[in-house]
Design a protein with these regions (language model features):
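Juxtamembrane/disordered regions of integral membrane proteins
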Residues: 1-167
Length: 167
């Protein structure tokens, strides 16, 4: 069987890519903010890790892997080309996903909240400062994680293909 269609290897590669992208995104986003935020960043990091892993796995599985197959089926054999196409499509789908989930989940009406001295929740409604910061943060996290996961998947896939073809 051609290594491109070995779904067992594909599943392992996709899982590794999702975890690599998630870990990379979490490190990029959380580690610089830990000294300034103290322990308050740790619960947010845990929340992000639960959000990131399924988003990257679905993004890579639903968008990245089909893009990889389409690029190879069209005659382009470069793993970098397939990785970039998959990463761009996955980033676009993540952008749509993120804009859809931004309106979900309102806090209770009596809740007020501040982050770094800025009020982000006023009487149970997110303030504009909160919405713009959340959108920018979520876009950065989604795009960085998907691209990181797609690149990790492309590199691992290339290694798997070379080993299979060298046998």
């Amino acid at each position: 069987m051609h290594p491109l269609f070995d779904f067992r290897k594909a599943a392992v590669t996709l899982a590794a890519a999702a975890l690599a992208g998630s870990a990379g995104t979490l490190a990029i986003f959380v580690l610089p903010s830990l000294p300034a935020a103290g322990l308050s960043a740790i619960p947010f990091a845990v929340f992000l890790s639960f959000l990131i892993v399924p988003v990257w796995f679905v993004g890579i599985l639903v968008v990245g892997y089909p893009a990889w197959i389409l690029v190879h089926a069209s005659g382009l054999r470069g793993w970098l080309t397939a990785t970039l196409v998959g990463a761009l499509l996955a980033a676009a789908s993540s952008f749509v996903f993120a804009t859809q989930i931004m309106g979900m989940g309102q806090p209770p009406a009596a809740v007020n909240g501040w982050v770094n001295g800025r009020q982000t929740i006023r009487n149970g409604a997110y303030t504009e400062a909160s919405r713009s910061a959340e959108r920018a943060t979520l876009m950065l996290v989604l795009v960085a994680g998907v691209v990181g996961g797609a690149c990790a998947g492309g590199a691992l896939w290339q290694v798997a293909c070379r080993r299979e073809l060298s046998r």
